[in-house]
Amino acid sequence: MMAGSLPDQQIDLRGISCPKNFIRCRLALEALDVNQLLQVDLDCGEPEEMVVSGLREAGHRVEIYSKEATWLRLMVTCGGG
């Protein structure tokens, strides 16, 4: 992500279990155009592993923007997948 880039959409999925969090990410990305940014706040652990790998497999670029003790913030660049 370029410094200073603001996300086009933001979703907070902390406390949302798998696979609901992944499905919500996919739905949010479907509403975006290619190269738009989605900010995702997500719990660490299984949600992080499942969502990050699933979105990458679907053709989106996923970067960990910041990480706290129990959650992290992802910046997902829509790949149109």
Where are these regions (language model features)?
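Intrinsic-disorder/low-complexity, polar/charged segments enriched in Ser/Thr/Lys/Arg/Asp/Glu/Gln
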Residues: 8, 37-39, 71-73
